[in-house]
């Protein structure tokens, strides 16, 4: 069976990592762009001429050259919304970055799927106009992702057996949540 990586290119952005490694937080979007373009140029040197200066342009050109769309994973997408809430420049730059990545129909030509993790709800933020085409799932509303949020009871039971732990004791310690029809930990 073919995995996701066999069909689509992947691009992972860990926003907390970028924030932790940038020398000046006000340059975070430029740093994300610079690092992402450097990584893409390493892999797709023939498809990215020097004048390519934005991530969306790079992804579009790679898709044109290879025919393959991307799966975009942005881990802790909301860290700049939370940690830099008082810095309007960072907020504006980041929202414009997200808008460039996801707004409108153009990104659908080179992005097959975008998966953003975070603790803040997308639709209730000022980013709504930048991120209004996402389906939002959470622990309170897991939808079809219920079995992927946390560990299912069957997975915890199997791990307990594998590592010689008492399942009932682990169950009492962690209690878990009921998401849809799934008991998760």
Predicted segments, located by residue:
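Substrate-engagement module of ASCE P-loop NTPases
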Residues: 61-63, 92-112
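Short glycine-rich substrate-engagement loop in P-loop NTPases that contacts/grips substrate
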Residues: 44-60
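Short, small-residue-biased leader/transition segments that mark boundaries at the very start
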Residues: 3-8
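Amphipathic alpha-helical segments of the small helical/lid subdomains adjacent to P-loop NTPase cores
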Residues: 126-132, 137-185
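A short hydrophobic beta-strand->loop->alpha-helix junction that borders the nucleotide-binding pocket
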Residues: 12-20
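Conserved P-loop NTPase "ATPase switch" module shared by AAA+ and STAND
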Residues: 66-91
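Switch/connector loops and helix/strand junctions flanking conserved nucleotide-binding motifs
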Residues: 19-24, 80-82, 123-129
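Structural recognition of the conserved hydrophobic beta-strand(s) that form the central parallel beta-sheet
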Residues: 71-75, 112-119
């Amino acid at each position: 069976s073919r995995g996701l990586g066999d069909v689509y290119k992947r691009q992972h952005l860990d926003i907390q990592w970028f924030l932790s490694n940038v020398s000046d937080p006000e340059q975070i979007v430029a740093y994300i762009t610079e690092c992402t373009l450097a990584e893409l140029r390493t892999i797709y040197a023939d498809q990215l001429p020097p004048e390519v200066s934005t991530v969306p342009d790079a992804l579009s050109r790679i898709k044109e050259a290879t025919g393959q769309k991307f799966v975009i994973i942005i881990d802790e997408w909301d860290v700049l919304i939370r940690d830099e809430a008082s810095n309007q420049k960072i907020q504006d730059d980041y929202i414009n970055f997200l808008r460039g990545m996801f707004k409108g129909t153009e990104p659908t030509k080179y992005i097959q799927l975008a998966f953003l993790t975070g603790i803040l709800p997308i639709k209730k933020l000022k980013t709504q106009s930048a991120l209004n085409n996402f389906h939002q799932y959470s622990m309170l509303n897991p939808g079809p992702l219920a079995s992927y949020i946390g560990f299912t009871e069957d997975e915890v039971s199997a791990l307990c057996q594998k590592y010689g732990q008492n399942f009932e004791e682990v169950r009492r310690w962690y209690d878990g949540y009921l998401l849809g029809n799934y008991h998760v930990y």
